[in-house]
UniProtKB/Swiss-Prot annotation:
Entry function: May be involved in the folding of the extracellular lipase during its passage through the periplasm.
GO term, biological process aspect, one: lipid catabolic process
Keyword Ribonucleoprotein included in the entry's annotation: no
GO cellular component: plasma membrane
GO molecular function, one term: unfolded protein binding
Name of this chain's protein: Lipase chaperone
Gene name tied to this protein: lifO
Annotated family: Belongs to the lipase chaperone family.
InterPro entries (UniProt xref): Lipase_chaperone
Compartment annotation: Cell inner membrane
Length: 344
């Protein structure tokens, strides 16, 4: 992950879950969906609302209050509901991935072991003592295996978007990994997303074909769009809107917009709650960057003091613990330190 003081770029984190479009296979995490409602159990509707497809959701009384020890990046939010089928088993639904992606939003705050423990707690909060709890834990381990396999790809699977052959290979490779690690969960987790990515790639192949005239390209694009199911067309419109919002956030950051200015402009695009969350992220990023810069200066003084490696490392660790007191901050700072060390 590229870091600005140890966090993913703001435009990436502004959308809470769901990797979408060709940006996913290019290694850019564009989080789709609305921001999580503070104090609710869903991204949009009431936590008691039925899950799509007539599936039941875990009993609402099992939900953990939003204030119950959430990582900083999820403060004031609640996890999505885990869907159940009529027999009480975990339903094979994209909503299960949404739950895990929500939890993964906290990975910059937590070590791998702490993230696992957090997911276990969040699952238990909804499904404790049920067969669905065991099933959800199994799917989590499968999903982690999928993500670990992606991370082991060359450049974490990132490819040159101008190379259509490489994009096609990346899509096929990710689909293979998903099926190998997730089994029959690969379709509910990634089926619709993979369809959209292949659709986007087909569009690119048409628009970049030098043998076609503009009229021929328009004709083929129109024919391709007609192949898209109505629900996919609606989903594509949402994705386009989300991409536009991400671009807007990036432009506002590039222009040096203040949190208040960013909030005012994004309110018109994302709504007041999402805009407020993005503005808060910007403030958090600025605060973190300032503290890490001060810490790095003090660390450099220790490194230049001529201490033995053991004493030097002990003093840097103590400094890190003094400066970064919130959960996960010291781990993130240590990770940045290692990155800075390898760069040197």
């Amino acid at each position: 992950m590229t870091a600005r003081g140890g966090r993913a770029p703001l435009a990436r984190r502004a959308m809470v879950y769901g990797v979408v479009g060709l940006a996913a296979i290019a290694g850019v995490a564009m989080w789709s969906g609305a921001s999580w409602h503070r104090g609710t159990g869903a991204a949009s509707d009431s936590p008691d609302a039925p899950v799509a497809g007539g599936l039941a959701a875990a009993p609402p009384q099992a939900a953990v209050p939003a204030s119950a020890g959430l990582p900083p990046s999820l403060a004031g939010s609640s996890a999505p509901r885990l869907p159940l089928d009529a027999g009480g088993h975990l339903a094979k639904s994209r909503a299960v991935r949404d739950f895990f992606d929500y939890c993964l939003t906290a990975q910059s705050d937590l070590s791998a072991a702490a993230l696992d423990a957090f997911v276990v707690r969040e699952i238990a909060a909804q499904l404790d003592g049920t067969v669905a709890q065991v099933e959800a834990l199994d799917v989590w381990h499968r999903y982690r295996a999928y993500l670990d396999a992606l991370a082991k790809l060359r450049d974490a699977g990132a490819v040159d978007k101008s190379d259509l052959g490489a994009l096609q290979l990346a899509l096929d490779q990710r689909a293979s990994i998903a099926y190998r690690t997730l089994g029959d969960w690969s379709q509910p987790f990634f089926g619709a997303e993979q369809w959209r990515q292949r659709y986007d790639l087909a569009r690119l192949k048409i628009t970049r074909d030098p043998t076609l005239t503009d009229a021929q390209k328009a004709e083929r694009l129109a024919a391709l769009e007609q192949q898209m199911p109505a629900d996919e067309r609606a989903a594509q419109k949402r994705i386009d809107k989300q991409r536009a919002a991400i671009d807007q956030i990036a432009q506002l950051q590039k222009s040096g917009a203040t949190p208040d200015a960013m909030r005012a402009q994004l309110t018109q695009t994302l709504g007041p709650e999402a805009a407020a969350r993005v503005a808060q992220m910007q403030q958090d990023d600025a605060s973190w960057q300032s503290r890490y810069t001060d810490y790095a200066a003090q660390r450099a003084q220790i490194e230049s003091a001529g201490l033995s490696p053991q004493d030097r490392d002990a003093q840097i660790t103590a400094l890190r613990q003094r400066v970064f007191t919130k959960p996960g901050e010291a781990v993130r700072a240590a990770s940045l330190d290692r990155g800075a060390g390898s760069a040197r």
